[in-house]
Curated annotation (Swiss-Prot):
Transmembrane feature ranges: 25-45, 69-90, 105-125, 170-190, 218-238, 280-300, 312-332, 339-358
Cofactor note: Binds 2 heme b groups non-covalently.
PANTHER family per record: CYTOCHROME B (PTHR19271:SF16)
Protein name as annotated: Cytochrome b
Self-association state and partner proteins as the record states: The cytochrome bc1 complex contains 3 respiratory subunits (MT-CYB, CYC1 and UQCRFS1), 2 core proteins (UQCRC1 and UQCRC2) and probably 6 low-molecular weight proteins.
Length: 371
């Protein structure tokens, strides 16, 4: 009976035999989420959401709380790992045409927006210089909304400037949103298993399926262990690798940092925002930088689902990756030549991918038909 039970469990989730390592990032994201919620809970126990005490409470966690430095650094490094995994996860989806499973793709994009909001609120909590000024700049973008902008901004701040009520509500939101992420992740996984996962060839894998366990479960375990090794290596040798030096100073509303910038994982969107010399235009471009992903399922024109056998689409895809990295780099630099023009050019190239993709699909279809 026990053998039959094991076989039953193994066959509950038949998976295509040819899915590659790029399909392991979903489980790695789940691992990151569990780690963030666990470390976040222990940090919340010792954190004080008050503008006079927040910075001191983070210092207290680092210095006085047993293993507090591990919790704090793991939480900070874990956030970066989370975004590295999610960007690879999205890139894999774009390359292999996984967006054709519309419900999964749209729920995933909603998850990304929720995750970015959560990370933004979390970045404000230490109440360092960069935390304060990044919050001031980003929340101030709401004033670009016609008619309602100023009212919404004042309501979000809880006053006429970023102050104690702002920090309190940002802490509340940072605490509650991960549970929304759990719910959305559950929906994402349920929708995925409704049709089943795709594979690198983009073909129907019903005729060639293997049990998830032990084959893919061991592969997942290997990648998760690799993730932990990388995280603990950074934690041990360079715990402040992803931190901004400016954030080691307490927030001072009277002194503006020379160069205001968010965490590295928001720099691509911030670079697009900064490349447009108009407040409303920049805000719309910032929103579009993420929401444009939602257009992918509706603009797919190629007869082939993945880019595996589409050389023109592959060139466009790798140009997008190079563009993403370049925008991230330029956004970390001051607003001066040559970074302004590079940022503007790469921003155009970023959006051009989503416009060119359907046109390249049509072109490739024509080439195939002629041959």
């Amino acid at each position: 009976m026990s053998n039959q039970h094991t076989l039953l469990i193994s066959n509950l989730l038949p998976v295509g035999s040819n899915i590659s390592t790029w399909w392991n990032f979903g489980s790695m994201l789940l691992t990151c989420l569990i780690l963030q919620i666990t470390t976040g809970f222990f940090l919340a126990i010792h954190y004080t959401a008050n503008i006079n005490l927040a910075f001191s409470s983070v210092t207290h966690i680092m210095r006085d709380v047993p293993y507090g430095w591990i919790m704090q650094n793991l939480h900070a490094i874990g956030a970066s790992m989370f975004f590295i995994c999610i960007y690879i996860h999205i890139a894999r989806g774009l390359y292999y045409g996984l967006y054709m499973n519309k419900n999964v793709w749209l729920s995933g994009t909603t998850l990304l927006i929720t995750l970015m909001a959560t990370a933004f609120f979390g970045y404000v909590l230490p109440w360092g210089q960069m935390s304060f000024w990044a919050a001031t700049v980003i929340t101030n973008l709401l004033t670009a909304i016609p008619y309602l902008g100023t009212t919404i901004t004042t309501w979000l701040w809880g006053g006429f400037s970023i102050n104690d009520p702002t920090l309190t509500r940002f802490f509340a939101l940072h605490f509650i949103l991960p549970f929304a992420i759990i719910s959305l992740s559950s929906i994402h996984i349920i929708l995925l298993h409704n049709k089943g996962s795709n594979n690198p060839l983009g073909t129907n894998s019903d005729i060639d399926k293997i049990p998830f366990h032990p084959y893919h479960s061991y592969k997942d375990t290997l990648m998760t262990i690799s993730l932990f090794i990388l995280m603990f290596t950074i934690l041990s040798f360079s715990p402040d690798l992803f931190n901004d030096p400016e954030n080691f100073s307490k927030a001072n509303p009277l002194v503006t940092p020379q160069h205001i910038k968010p965490e590295w994982y928001f720099l691509f969107a911030y670079g697009i925002l900064r490349s447009i010399p108009n407040k409303l235009g920049g805000t719309l471009a910032l929103l579009m930088s993420v929401t444009i992903l939602m257009t992918a399922p509706f603009t797919h024109t190629s007869h082939m689902r993945p880019m595996t056998f589409r050389p023109l689409a592959q060139m466009a895809f790798w140009t997008l990756i190079a563009t993403f990295i370049t925008i991230t780099w330029t956004a970390s630099k001051p607003v001066e030549p040559p970074f302004i023009i590079i940022s503007q050019m790469t921003s155009i190239l970023y959006f051009l991918f989503f416009i060119m993709n359907p046109l390249l699909g049509w072109t490739e279809n024509k080439i195939m038909m002629n041959n």
